Amino acid sequence: GSEMCIRDRYSLSILTFGEVIMNKPFIAIEGPIGVGKSSLAHRLSKTFGFYEEKEIVDENPFLSDFYDDIEKWSFQTEMFFLCNRYKQIRDIESLNQGIVSDYHIHKNKIFAKNTLDAKEFDKFSRIFDILTEDIEMPNTIIFLDADLDVLKSRIAQRNRSFESQIEDDYLLTLKKDYLAYYESLKNDGANVIRIDTSQQDFVKNDYDYQNILNLVKPMIGENKDE
């Protein structure tokens, strides 16, 4: 029943994170829509000389329809994202350098849980498990969070037409689910950190960025001080 569903949602966390391989850090940045994942991934990739893995969003042909009618288009939307992210990770597995990604493939299950009915979510989860059973997973995760008003402001600033219809309840649910996922990983001893960015601007403010950098460096085996 619901207990099994909740347990299954987080079952990957135990399998996904082993010991951090310091000679090839693989950082994933996660959090709700508009929190600053891509911006931080870009800065970290420049700082560390890592390959920047960017999530493909605009190319999803179902996305604008999805926000118009979530129930009708959710399965197609989530499957497109899952297959694209699977291919992206496959493409970077042979890289010899560190990687910083603005997503973790597990986000598919977080979003799908909120948009699919029970039958579709079960079907989606089985496909997800098959695709992810043998792919390389991040060994370091940074969870970003921010207050609802901050998220809405940042979403408005980037002016993506299909995001203008996102409702407050949807964002609040994502915030809650990301926090639950973070807690589950933390309890499993994973290499994770959570940063509230409501009062921080790590894009324009170097002091804020340096504070984040000082938290991230020990996670990937680098000295805290430059």
Listing of model-derived features with the role each one plays in the protein:
Residues 40-41:
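Post-Walker A alpha-helix
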